[in-house]
C-alpha cells in the first residue's frame, strides 16, 4: 500500500482563507469547497466544479430533541447556530488499496481534507465538521468529541442543505422510510411535487412516504450546462438512513432522516460521528459510474482473513415461485402456524412446493453441469403458511426443514457435485425473532457447509412501529453482517437499507437488493430505462443482486402469467456487465436455459470479479457500455445496455493488450428484435480482433449486446 498523509499550509496545496471563509480544493484543482460562518454563527458551505456552481451556499447543523434521555434533558439546545471557529486543519491523503472483490484490482484514495473545529459558547459544546475533497466530488460529516456538556443527545432532525444552482433534470425515487422498490422517475426538480403520488408504488408491502417533495438517495441529476451531480451518503452506521426533502421554490434539498418508532431520528453517545454526506460531480457521465468516492469514505476492511469470501454465480429455486405461482409453503392445511406446536409430519403436501428434495437435486445437477457455484433454495424451512401480513413475531426458526426437504442429504449431494447450497433466511421483518435464532441458524449453516445466506425483510418491521431505514434497523443489518463474518458466512441482504459502501469494511456483504429488481418483471414489468438508471443511482453505494438472466422473456410460454420482461434476450446478457455485482444469479429455469443454450453460454462464461473496468459510453436512462477484464486472466467482457430508445454503439477496442489477438463472441440484437414485439431475436457471431479494432453494434428498444473476448 502506498500512503502519504502530510499536513500542509496555505495556498501551496490549494487552500485559501479569506476573512471568515476557508477553501479546500481537490488534488487536481477541479473541485473546490468553501466553508464559512454566517453573522449569527451558522455553519455554511458551497461547492464548485471547474468554476461552475454545484452546491450554492448551504447551511449545516442538527436540531436536538428536548428529551429526558439526553444529557441536558428538557433543557436541550440545538447545534444549529451561535458557533465560533476555534481551529482549522488541512491535510492531504493518498493511498492505493486492494478490495477483496470489485470492479478493479486496486482503488486510489486521494483527497485533500479540511477539518473545522467549532465551539458554541452558549452551550459550551464543541463539534467538528470535516470535509474530504476528491477530484470527482466531496464528502462532509459532523463529529462530536466526548466532552462534559455533550455526552448523550437525541436527534430531532439533521439540517444539512444542498442548494442546487438551477432546476436540474433528476432521476429520483419517492422518499420512503420502508422501500426502494419503486420505478425511478425522470423530471425537472420543479416537477417532483406534481408527479409524486403517481410515482409511488402504493401496492408495495410497506410504503411510508413523508413529503410530496421527498426523494431518496442516491439522487442523480444533470444540469443544463452539462454537469452530472449525485447526492448520497457513505458509511451509514449507527445512524438513520438519509433522504432528501426539496424546497422547490429555492431548489434546495435538506437532509431528512428516517425516524424510529418514537418518531425521533437518532440516539447518540459521544464520541461519535454522522455518516458522510456526499456530492459527486463530473462533466462526463462515465466518471459517475467509475467513481469510488463512496467506498473510499468507508473504513478499511475489518476482517483479517478474507480467504473464505469469494464471488459467486448461482441459480435457484425462486423464479418458479415469483413468476410461476408455485408456493414457498409446504401445505395448504394450516391457516396459522405455531413453531414447536404445529405438526407438519401428518400434513398433506400441497403439491406445488418446489423446495423439495427431488426438484432441488435437478437444480444441483444443472449447476454442476454448467459451472455454477451455488443453488439458492427458498421455502425450505417451516413457517411459510402464515408468514406474511400478520405482523407476527415468532414466524421462522431458520433451522427446521419441511418434511420434503432433506437438509443433510441435499448438502451432501451438492458437495459431491462440487456445488454448495445457498441458505435463505426470510425474516418477515421480525428482526428480534431473527436475532434470537441467529446463532443457531448460523451454526446450522456451518454444520452443513453453507457459506452464503440471502436474507429478506418483507413486510412491516418488528419491533412494531419501526421503519426499515431507522437507526435501530441499520444497526440490526450491520449486526447480522458482523455475526455472519464470525461464522465465515457471506450475506446477500434483500429489502434491507440501501448500501453506503460498508462492503469495503465488511466485504462478506457481497450483495444487496434495495431496489426494484428482476422480480418485478413478473409483476407487470419495469420500464426499459430502469436498468440504465440504476448504475447511476442505487449501485453508487454498492453492488446489487439484480437477479438477471431471464432468457424466456414471455412468461406465458411456461406459466399462467401474462407479464413479460421489458428487455430483449440479449439485453438480459448485458446486465451481467452493466449491473456490477460479485454475486450473480442465473435466475431463469433450467429448462429455459436449455431452450436458449447458445445464449446461455455467455452467462456460463462471464466472470463475477474483475481486474479492470472501463466505462466506454454512458448517459443516464439512455445507454451504458462497459468493458471489464476478468480477474487473473487476459480475457475481457463487454456489455452494452440501452433503454427505451435504440442506440448505435461504436466500440474502439483500445483497452485490449497490444500485440495480442482475441476471439470475440458477439451476442447482439437481431435487426428485427424489439423488447415487446420480438424480444428473443438475436445473433451470435465470432471473429478475431485486436487492439484498435472498431465494432459497431446496434441496440434496439430495450436491447443490448454482450461480447466475450478470449485472449489467444
Put a short name on every predicted segment.
Residues 1-23:
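Bacterial Sec-dependent N-terminal signal peptides
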Residues 23-304:
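N-terminal accessory beta-strand-rich subdomains and adjacent acidic, glycine-rich linkers
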Residues 269-362, 370, 374:
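An acidic-aromatic substrate-binding cleft motif
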Residues 359-380, 447-451:
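Catalytic domains of carbohydrate-active enzymes, especially glycoside hydrolases
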Residues 378-564, 568:
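Aromatic- and carboxylate-enriched substrate-binding clefts and catalytic-loop regions
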Residues 570-617:
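Catalytic cores of secreted or luminal carbohydrate-active enzymes
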Residues 620-662, 705-706:
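Carbohydrate-binding surface patches
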Residues 686-712:
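C-terminal beta-strand-rich structural cap/linker in extracellular carbohydrate-active enzymes
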Amino acid at each position: 500500500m502506498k500512503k502519504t498523509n502530510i499536513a500542509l499550509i496555505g495556498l501551496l496545496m490549494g487552500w485559501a482563507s479569506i476573512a471568515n471563509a476557508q477553501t479546500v480544493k481537490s488534488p487536481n484543482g477541479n473541485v473546490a469547497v468553501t466553508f464559512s460562518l454566517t453573522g449569527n454563527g451558522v455553519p455554511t458551505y458551497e461547492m464548485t466544479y471547474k468554476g461552475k456552481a454545484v452546491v450554492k451556499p448551504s447551511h449545516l447543523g442538527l436540531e436536538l430533541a428536548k428529551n429526558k434521555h439526553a444529557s441536558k434533558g428538557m433543557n436541550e439546545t440545538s447545534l444549529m447556530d451561535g458557533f465560533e471557529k476555534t481551529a482549522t486543519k488541512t491535510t492531504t491523503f493518498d493511498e492505493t488499496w486492494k478490495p477483496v472483490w470489485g470492479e478493479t484490482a486496486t482503488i486510489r484514495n486521494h483527497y485533500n481534507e479540511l477539518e473545522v473545529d467549532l465551539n458554541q459558547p452558549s452551550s459550551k459544546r464543541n463539534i467538528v465538521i470535516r470535509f474530504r475533497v476528491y477530484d470527482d466530488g466531496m464528502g462532509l460529516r459532523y463529529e462530536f468529541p466526548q466532552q462534559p456538556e455533550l455526552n448523550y443527545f437525541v436527534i430531532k432532525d439533521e439540517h444539512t442543505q444542498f442548494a442546487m444552482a438551477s432546476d436540474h433534470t433528476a432521476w429520483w425515487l419517492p422518499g420512503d422510510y420502508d422501500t426502494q422498490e419503486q420505478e425511478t422517475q425522470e423530471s425537472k426538480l420543479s416537477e417532483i411535487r406534481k408527479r409524486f403520488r403517481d410515482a409511488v408504488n402504493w401496492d408495495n408491502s410497506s410504503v411510508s412516504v413523508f413529503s410530496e417533495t421527498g426523494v431518496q438517495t442516491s439522487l442523480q441529476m444533470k444540469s443544463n450546462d452539462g454537469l452530472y451531480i449525485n447526492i448520497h451518503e457513505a458509511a451509514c452506521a449507527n445512524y438513520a438512513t438519509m433522504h432528501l426533502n426539496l424546497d422547490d421554490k429555492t431548489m434546495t434539498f435538506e437532509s431528512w432522516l428516517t425516524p424510529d418508532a418514537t418518531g425521533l431520528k437518532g440516539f447518540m453517545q459521544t464520541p461519535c460521528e454522522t455518516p458522510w454526506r456526499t456530492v459527486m460531480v463530473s462533466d462526463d457521465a462515465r466518471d459517475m459510474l467509475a467513481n469510488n468516492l463512496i467506498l473510499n469514505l468507508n473504513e478499511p476492511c475489518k476482517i483479517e482473513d478474507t480467504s473464505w469470501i469469494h464471488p459467486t454465480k448461482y441459480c435457484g429455486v425462486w423464479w418458479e415461485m415469483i413468476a410461476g405461482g408455485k408456493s414457498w409453503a409446504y401445505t395448504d392445511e394450516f391457516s396459522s402456524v405455531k413453531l414447536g406446536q404445529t405438526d407438519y409430519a401428518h400434513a398433506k403436501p400441497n403439491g406445488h412446493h418446489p423446495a423439495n428434495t427431488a426438484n432441488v437435486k435437478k437444480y444441483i445437477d444443472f449447476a454442476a453441469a454448467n459451472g455454477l457455484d451455488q443453488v439458492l433454495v427458498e421455502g425450505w424451512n417451516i413457517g411459510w403458511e402464515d408468514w406474511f401480513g400478520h405482523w407476527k413475531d415468532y414466524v421462522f426458526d431458520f433451522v427446521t426443514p419441511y418434511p420434503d426437504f432433506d437438509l443433510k442429504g441435499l448438502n451432501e449431494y451438492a458437495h459431491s457435485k462440487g456445488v454448495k447450497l445457498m441458505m435463505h433466511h426470510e425474516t418477515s421483518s421480525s428482526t428480534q425473532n431473527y436475532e434470537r435464532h441467529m446463532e443457531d441458524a448460523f451454526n446450522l449453516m456451518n454444520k452443513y457447509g453453507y457459506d452464503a445466506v440471502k436474507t429478506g425483510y418483507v413486510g412491516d418491521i418488528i419491533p412494531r412501529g419501526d421503519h426499515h431505514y431507522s437507526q435501530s434497523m441499520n444497526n440490526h443489518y450491520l449486526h447480522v453482517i458482523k455475526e455472519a463474518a464470525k461464522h465465515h458466512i457471506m450475506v446477500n441482504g434483500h429489502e434491507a437499507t440501501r448500501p453506503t459502501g460498508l462492503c469495503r469494511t465488511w466485504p462478506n456483504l457481497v450483495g444487496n437488493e434495495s431496489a426494484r429488481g428482476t422480480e418485478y418483471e413478473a409483476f407487470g414489468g419495469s420500464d426499459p430505462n430502469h436498468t440504465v438508471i440504476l448504475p447511476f443511482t442505487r449501485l453508487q453505494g454498492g453492488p446489487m443482486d439484480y437477479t438477471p438472466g431471464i432468457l424466456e422473456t414471455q412468461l406465458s410460454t411456461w406459466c399462467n402469467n401474462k407479464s413479460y420482461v421489458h428487455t430483449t434476450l440479449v439485453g438480459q446478457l448485458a446486465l451481467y456487465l452493466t449491473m456490477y455485482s460479485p454475486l450473480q444469479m442465473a435466475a431463469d429455469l433450467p429448462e429455459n436455459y436449455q431452450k436458449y443454450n447458445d445464449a446461455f453460454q455467455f452467462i456460463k462464461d462471464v466472470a463475477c470479479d474483475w481486474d479492470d473496468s472501463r466505462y466506454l459510453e454512458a448517459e443516464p436512462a439512455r445507454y451504458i457500455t462497459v468493458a471489464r477484464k476478468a480477474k487473473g486472466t487476459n480475457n475481457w467482457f463487454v456489455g452494452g445496455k440501452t433503454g427505451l430508445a435504440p442506440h448505435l454503439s461504436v466500440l474502439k477496442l483500445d483497452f485490449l493488450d497490444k500485440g495480442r489477438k482475441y476471439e470475440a463472441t458477439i451476442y447482439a440484437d437481431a435487426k428485427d428484435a424489439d423488447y415487446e414485439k420480438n424480444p428473443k431475436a438475436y445473433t451470435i457471431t465470432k471473429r478475431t480482433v485486436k487492439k484498435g479494432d472498431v465494432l459497431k453494434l446496434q441496440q434496439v428498444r430495450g436491447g443490448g449486446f454482450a461480447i466475450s473476448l478470449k485472449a489467444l
